[in-house]
């Protein structure tokens, strides 16, 4: 389509911080009250060559962090398809992980427990018989991915708020222990 990538050429236009604290009651669940309390950093970016804007929103909770990309309404970015996302998650060690193979068509697998460095060697054996399978990489896993560090800290990588956006798998660079987001394509390959 001739449009410049949204991967580079951005400058920071503005940053702002805020805090939020509320308690809400779910209709159903184990807890009567749920506290939603976080500190937030909003980074507003402008791509200098195109004049397009993108925001990065980070939220820090007592028990986790989250981030998302936002595309404010703008004349020069009305309709677009995100085919790839290159978010990376660098692990601090060869953690124990509970994972299933990254597959576009099914999540019907038993979980495997292994070190991150062992995923490549175990993945093919973790693929059980199923009529509809599309494993995308020898080191690809599905989210949510649960891990435990040698110090006993639990880590969970997952996506949230998927509105008009593809679900995320993770592809592991097993030499450097870095996961990169890997989006599930739609029916026509976007």
What are these regions (language model features)?
Residues 1-190:
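N-terminal accessory beta-strand-rich subdomains and adjacent acidic, glycine-rich linkers
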């Amino acid at each position: 389509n001739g449009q410049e990538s949204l991967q580079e050429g951005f400058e920071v236009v503005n940053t702002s911080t805020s805090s939020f604290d509320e308690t809400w009651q779910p209709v159903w669940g184990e807890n009567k009250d749920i506290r939603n309390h976080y500190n937030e950093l909003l980074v507003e970016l402008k791509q200098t060559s195109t004049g397009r804007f993108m925001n990065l929103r980070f939220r820090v909770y007592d028990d986790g962090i989250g981030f998302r990309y936002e595309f404010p309404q703008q004349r020069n970015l009305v309709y677009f398809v995100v085919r790839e996302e290159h978010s990376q998650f660098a692990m601090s060690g060869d953690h124990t992980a509970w994972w299933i193979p990254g597959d576009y068509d099914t999540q019907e697998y038993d979980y495997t427990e292994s070190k991150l460095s062992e995923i490549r060697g175990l993945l093919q054996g973790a693929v059980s018989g199923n009529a509809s399978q599309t494993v995308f990489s020898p080191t690809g896993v599905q989210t949510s991915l649960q891990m435990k560090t040698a110090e006993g800290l639990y880590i969970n990588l997952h996506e949230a708020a998927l509105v008009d956006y593809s679900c995320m798998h993770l592809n592991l660079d097993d030499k450097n222990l870095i996961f990169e987001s890997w989006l599930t394509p739609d029916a026509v390959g976007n």
